[in-house]
């Protein structure tokens, strides 16, 4: 039906300046991902949808973006296909259709986050627990002479536990000093003899206490239709790159195990990022050299009011050169 209302968005703007991204953000949607022979996965997801706006146009037609999102989600629900990497494909389909619907735009971008719940077992008591993981999809489409070209990324954000190596070593030395002075006072030993004995008592393989942080690790990897990356693999890499995993449920034996595991594997925020990098290069050796990789770690400090941050933005090729792979 032909609209009788004026198309204000297509009018000339007062200030003819090109805008890089215009759109709608924070759209909440239920995303039902069908899987062959398995129960569908339902994600509570948030979408950000953007297109660029030419200098000669006042505004974008925002309702078109919402219509595109709804159409693609309905098509996905009717589909019989599904895989671990479907979210970046979903973002790709949305971004391409945004350019088809917004014929004045030359670039579109889709960013999606969702919460994936995975079944786990506690480390000692083996009780069932459900653990939440934030999964991320992103796609950018550009209009070119050869048609629409799209680049897409998939990733995850995982919460874990880190233990501070610096405080751990300080506590070890502090423990040796306390034991040394106790030996000198109670056994009347000379300082050198007491120091040697204290070193044997406070052994290097005994890990003292240290302060902990709740770590948040993030990996985003560029993928293509040919090269796939499993979200489960990304989650595993992030989780194993911290001092210890966290759990929604912990009985006392489990709590002891997690605490000891963290102290036995202390890591700075920088260590976590470098460990993720090493595991990415090993696990995804089939990815092309030009695949973009973003690795980030934020540790929420327990003894400071600020957080610790480390990040690497690079390509698989650069990482292979650095690690000699």
Swiss-Prot record:
**Function, as annotated:** Converts GTP to 7,8-dihydro-D-neopterin 2',3'-cyclic phosphate, the first intermediate in the biosynthesis of coenzyme methanopterin.
Annotated coiled-coil positions are none
Q: Where is this site: May be catalytically important?
A: 164
Q: Which EC numbers characterise this protein's activity in its record?
A: 3.5.4.39
GO BP annotations of the record are: tetrahydromethanopterin biosynthetic process
* Subunit structure of this chain's protein: Homodimer.
- Keyword Iron attached: yes
Q: Which UniProt keywords apply?
A: Hydrolase, Iron, Metal-binding
Family named by the database record: Belongs to the GTP cyclohydrolase IV family.
Q: What is the cofactor note?
A: Binds 1 Fe(2+) ion per subunit.
- What is the name of this protein? GTP cyclohydrolase MptA
GO molecular function: any one?
A: GTP cyclohydrolase IV activity
Cysteine pairs forming cystine bridges in this chain are none
**Known catalytic reactions:** GTP + H2O = 7,8-dihydroneopterin 2',3'-cyclic phosphate + formate + diphosphate + H(+)
Pfam family, any one? GCHY-1
Pathway membership of this protein?
A: Cofactor biosynthesis; 5,6,7,8-tetrahydromethanopterin biosynthesis
Question: PANTHER family attached here?
Answer: GTP CYCLOHYDROLASE MPTA
Originating species: Methanopyrus kandleri (strain AV19 / DSM 6324 / JCM 9639 / NBRC 100938)
Organism domain of life: Archaea
Q: What is the required cofactor set for this protein?
A: Fe(2+)
